[in-house]
């Protein structure tokens, strides 16, 4: 009860970030397209439920080469696991109304319609929420009435018109902040383009995740955040189990950018070359006869870590 009251008293903003480093070899748990799609959806759902802001696909050149050589499928994307994972992770995160514009039909998207939409943002709402006026949208075309104005489809009953000093190409995805006013004479709402992180930083609302890839040895060096990652959690189901009290004691007093590294045999060969605070823990209290699969490891880890990260993240 004491921890719940502490969490409820936290300010309604969130400047810290949580990233997940996922080895592309994790895709080995599934042996056909339908199961691979199911695996990616499960990862996407766990990531969205626990407010993870970034997914980093860790590449191992030897694994990629072996996959390309031994994959017999006619689908070229299955020969490139990084491309396959990136496409599906981004597809599941993208609002439904803009998927057709951003993702042309491809064989590897065949089974994506079998899975429910992720519980993200306010994508399903068709009206403006005055208390939280952010929306994801897609550029449709420049406004014919004014220079540097663009029409945005934000999944609402009215389009949104925004200003931009730089050129916005059609089908560009943007985050907009709607202004509190009625539609203009053309039936358009007015808004401003803001950063993807604005809803999280200003209002504390989880707004989805970004996806990037890098070599496993370049994980911390390639961080997109200023100052890089300052807290690294290596999740390894092969290490000794620790209690929740021991786990919380090992966390830093505060952090800005945490990265959770989901380990497997490939990643364990690479050293995380960083000065960041680093811990390694086994999310399971007991050992298993069979190794748990990646989504089980991630879910178990977030079950134990989520409240602790919430308490220690800088706001």
From Swiss-Prot:
The alphabetized UniProt keywords are:
Cytoplasm, Methyltransferase, Nucleus, Transferase
GO biological process, any: methylation
Q: Does the keyword Cell membrane apply?
A: no
Q: Per its record, what are the GO molecular function terms?
A: RNA methyltransferase activity
> Mainly localized where?
cytoplasm
Annotated GO CC locations: cytosol; nucleolus; nucleus
- Protein EC: 2.1.1.-
Coiled-coil-forming residues are none
What InterPro entries does the database record attribute to this sequence?
Answer: Alpha/beta_knot_MTases, NA-bd_OB-fold, Put_MeTrfase-C9orf114-like, tRNA_m1G_MTases_N
Q: Which family does it belong to?
A: Belongs to the class IV-like SAM-binding methyltransferase superfamily.
What this protein is called in its record is Putative methyltransferase SPBC8D2.16c
Give the source species. Schizosaccharomyces pombe (strain 972 / ATCC 24843) (Fission yeast)
